[in-house]
UniProtKB/Swiss-Prot annotation:
<comment type="subunit">
    <text>Homodimer.</text>
</comment>
<dbReference type="GO" id="GO:0042803">
    <property type="term" value="F:protein homodimerization activity"/>
</dbReference>
<comment type="function">
    <text>Participates actively in the response to hyperosmotic and heat shock by preventing the aggregation of stress-denatured proteins, in association with DnaK and GrpE. It is the nucleotide exchange factor for DnaK and may function as a thermosensor. Unfolded proteins bind initially to DnaJ; upon interaction with the DnaJ-bound protein, DnaK hydrolyzes its bound ATP, resulting in the formation of a stable complex. GrpE releases ADP from DnaK; ATP binding to DnaK triggers the release of the substrate protein, thus completing the reaction cycle.</text>
</comment>
<keyword id="KW-0346">Stress response</keyword>
<dbReference type="InterPro" id="IPR009012">
    <property type="entry name" value="GrpE_head"/>
</dbReference>
<keyword id="KW-0963">Cytoplasm</keyword>
<dbReference type="GO" id="GO:0051087">
    <property type="term" value="F:protein-folding chaperone binding"/>
</dbReference>
<dbReference type="Pfam" id="PF01025">
    <property type="entry name" value="GrpE"/>
</dbReference>
<dbReference type="InterPro" id="IPR000740">
    <property type="entry name" value="GrpE"/>
</dbReference>
<dbReference type="GO" id="GO:0000774">
    <property type="term" value="F:adenyl-nucleotide exchange factor activity"/>
</dbReference>
<comment type="similarity">
    <text>Belongs to the GrpE family.</text>
</comment>
<dbReference type="GO" id="GO:0051082">
    <property type="term" value="F:unfolded protein binding"/>
</dbReference>
<dbReference type="GO" id="GO:0005737">
    <property type="term" value="C:cytoplasm"/>
</dbReference>
<keyword id="KW-0143">Chaperone</keyword>
<dbReference type="InterPro" id="IPR013805">
    <property type="entry name" value="GrpE_coiled_coil"/>
</dbReference>
<feature type="region of interest" description="Disordered">
    <location>
        <begin position="1"/>
        <end position="40"/>
    </location>
</feature>
<dbReference type="GO" id="GO:0006457">
    <property type="term" value="P:protein folding"/>
</dbReference>
Length: 205
């Protein structure tokens, strides 16, 4: 019996059957069953790769847009700074010119006085005119002299150079202006340098 089986295995038909036989099962069938499960996983990975690429491209585009916007803002800032510097310079020149213009007539009269050959009285009158013009020029710039002689001493606007004993005027009244003081509107430019009275009778009373 075994010899007969052995002989059948040696025939061409038996050899083909032996080659097609699978003692451990059918591997082809098992592989065919695994392929459908692997295909969805590969599809998921492919979609993830595409999503990451899209995010990368979007990030690169955002970075380029940000760099362009930053460059534009920097250019606008530089232009604004240059424009502000130019306007400041023009305003300063205008202010200086406006101030100097008020004193040009005063300078003209000084030059005329130097060239004058008149008498001492005429020269004095010319100087008085120049002083008046100077005062008007200062007032046109809102620069006002501080009141002194006859006013009560005010340490906010007066600086006492000396106290002089006087009984005919109130104590601490300004009796002499040594140097004129000025203010521009309400702001003090410089205090007036003055001499003030010291009335001992009023002090004792």
């Amino acid at each position: 019996m075994s010899r007969k089986l052995h002989e059948e295995e040696l025939t061409p038909e038996g050899m083909d059957a032996a080659q097609n036989a699978d003692p451990a099962g059918d591997p082809v069938s098992e592989n065919e069953g695994a392929l459908p499960a692997a295909e969805p996983q590969a599809q998921i990975l492919q979609e993830e790769v595409e999503r990451l690429r899209a995010e990368r491209d979007a990030a690169l585009a955002d970075r380029e847009a940000f760099q362009d916007r930053l460059a534009r803002l920097q250019a606008e800032f530089d232009n604004a700074r240059k424009r502000e510097a130019k306007e400041r310079s023009e305003f300063r020149d205008y202010s200086v010119a406006s101030t100097a213009e008020a004193f040009l007539p005063v300078l003209d009269n000084f030059q005329l006085a130097l060239a004058s050959t008149g008498t001492a009285e005429q020269l004095r009158m010319g100087v008085e005119l120049i002083v008046k013009q100077m005062d008007e020029a200062l007032r046109s710039l809102s620069i006002i002299p501080i009141e002194t002689v006859g006013a009560q001493f005010d340490p906010r606007v007066h600086e006492a150079l000396e106290m002089v004993e006087r009984e005919d005027v109130p104590d601490h009244q300004v009796i002499e202006e040594v140097r004129r003081g000025y203010r521009i509107r309400e702001r003090l430019m410089r205090p007036a340098l003055v001499r003030i009275a010291s009335n001992s009778k009023q002090t004792q009373a």
